[in-house]
Amino acid sequence: MLSFKIRDKTFESRLFLGTGKFGSNQQMEEAILASGSELVTVALKRIDLETQTDAILAHLKHPRINLLPNTSGARNAKEAIFAAQLAREALETNWLKLEIHPDPKYLMPDAIETLKATEELAKLGFIILPYIHADPVLCKRLEEAGTSAVMPLGSPIGSNKGLKTIDFLEIIIEQSKVPVIIDAGIGAPSDAAKAMELGADAVLVNTAIAIAGNPKLMAEAFKEAVMAGRKAYEAKLAQKASQAVASSPLTAFLYE
C-alpha cells in the first residue's frame, strides 16, 4: 500500500481518528495505537490551551502520532479563525481541521463560512483540512482558496449511516488536485473499505470505533479494512458487467 502526502507530512496509514466519545482516555489511546493511525483530531474545546494540562494530551504523546486540532463548536468564520490562532500558539502546529457548524442538532457544515475562513487562514499560513458537504463545486473553490485537503462527509456526523453521498464523492475524487479524506458517517469497516475502493486518499473515523463494544478490536478491524480497500483500488478493480460472463467457458468443449 503506497504512502501519501499532505503538504509537508507523509503518511503510511490512511486511517485518521477522532478522539471524542471514548469511555476513557486510556481506551482512546489503546484504540489509536491499535489502528496504526498517524493523525488524530482533537477538539480545541477539550483542551486547556493555557496550561495544556488536559489529560487527553498525555495519551496522545507518541512518536508516530500527529495532532490535528479542530474548530468544532465554531459557528462562523470569525470564531474559527480565532480558535485556529489559539491552537497554533498553544500546540505549536499550523495544521487545522476546519469545522464550522452553527446548527447544534444536525452539525451540518456551513459552506459559506468555511470558504470564507479558508481564504483567510490560508493567508495566515495554516495547513487547512476543511470538513464540508460532499459538494464538488465547493471542493474546487476551497482548492483554489488554498486548502491542503478536503474532507467531504459520507453522511451526518455520528450517524454511522455510511456513504450516503457516494455519487458526489466519486466526482470529488475524480476532480480533486488535493487529497480527499472522507469524514463523518463511516459506521463500519466495510464503509471505510468502500471509501478506499472509490479512490479516497484517507478516511477519518471516530464514533464507529469509540462506541463499539470493543473499541480496540474495532480499531484493528478498521485498520485492516482501509488497507484492503486501498490495495483493491491500487490493484484496479474489475469492471462491472451488465450480464453474466463465464470465468471458464465450456462451449467449445461441449460441442466438439
Curated annotation (Swiss-Prot):
InterPro entries listed in its UniProt record: Aldolase_TIM (IPR013785), Thiazole_synthase_ThiG (IPR033983), ThiG (IPR008867)
UniProt catalytic activity: [ThiS sulfur-carrier protein]-C-terminal-Gly-aminoethanethioate + 2-iminoacetate + 1-deoxy-D-xylulose 5-phosphate = [ThiS sulfur-carrier protein]-C-terminal Gly-Gly + 2-[(2R,5Z)-2-carboxy-4-methylthiazol-5(2H)-ylidene]ethyl phosphate + 2 H2O + H(+)
Listed EC numbers: 2.8.1.10
GO annotations of cellular component type: cytoplasm
GO BP term, example: thiamine diphosphate biosynthetic process
Residue sites binding 1-deoxy-D-xylulose 5-phosphate per the record: G158, A184, G185, N206, T207
SUPFAM superfamilies in the record: ThiG-like
Protein name stated in the entry: Thiazole synthase
UniProt GO MF annotations: thiazole synthase activity
Active-site residues (renumbered): K97
Pfam family membership, one: ThiG
Family: Belongs to the ThiG family.
Subcellular location: Cytoplasm
